Amino acid sequence: MRNFKDKKADIELIYKTANNLNLPIHIFLPEGDIHKAQAVLVIHGGGWNDAIKDNSPWNGGWMGNNARYLAENGFIGIAVSYRSLMVSEELNVGDILLDCADAIRYIKEHLKFIDFGDIIYMGDSAGGYLVTVLGLSQNDELRPKAVVSLNPVLGLLDSKWKYGFNNCADIGKLTPKNIIGEKCARFLFMHGTNDSTVEIEYTEELNDMLRKTGHKSELVKIPDAQHAFILYDYKYPDEYVTDIMDRIITYINAELK
């Protein structure tokens, strides 16, 4: 067993090139038969900017440790990244979503040992927004079995986030509460009650809307937690983050196997 703080991936791939940037996928494998392992795809946050800006080696980003920890607990951990909006003024969040969709299509085409009928998407902050939209997709090719969305950015027109939607023809089509349809992944939201970066009220609203429309959704409030409580080497000690990760793994094993 490897130390989960080691973000060196077992498989490193480029899923596409856009704006002259090579966009990466890092895969962390568990011990044993990988064909029997459930996959969790993690998408990091960092606003709309803290992503791929150049072609320097990628170290797995904010959630590489989380992907490795999942692998150490029997899952296939998959970390993907996307274009930073700092690359071009012409880019917006719609392009980031396109990157994530292309990563999913690449994995489905090239990594046949991953069971997409059983896959889970997990994202933090801006990544929480991205996995939420993918979980609401009416496209069966993109929608996962379940989503774990951690303090997701949902107030898209708030001053902190609306820059990501410049040049968007219709922001309504990128707003989660506006795109709830007949098909929907199962959702687990987790949000800190002391989050001053992304307000919990937006998550409460979306969770309530999903439940009222008959979809399976649960919101776990983390008492006194600040933003990005799931990240190692950020605000909280390893033990705190690992406890949250273990709660997520317990949920997956109990509810999503």
Short names for language-model regions:
Residues 102-165:
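Primarily recognizes the serine-hydrolase "nucleophile elbow" in alpha/beta-hydrolase
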Residues 189-191, 195:
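Short beta-strand/loop motif that positions the catalytic acidic residue
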Residues 33-35, 40-69:
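Short, surface-exposed "cap/lid" segments of acyl-processing enzymes
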Residues 196-202:
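Conserved alpha/beta-hydrolase "acid-adjacent" motif
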Residues 204, 213-257:
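C-terminal catalytic histidine-bearing segment of alpha/beta-hydrolase fold enzymes
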Residues 42-45, 79, 189:
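Structural cue for short, hydrophobic secondary-structure segments
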Residues 57-69, 78-116, 237-239:
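Catalytic nucleophile-loop/oxyanion-hole region of alpha/beta-hydrolase
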Residues 1-35:
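N-terminal cap/lid segment of alpha/beta-hydrolase-fold proteins
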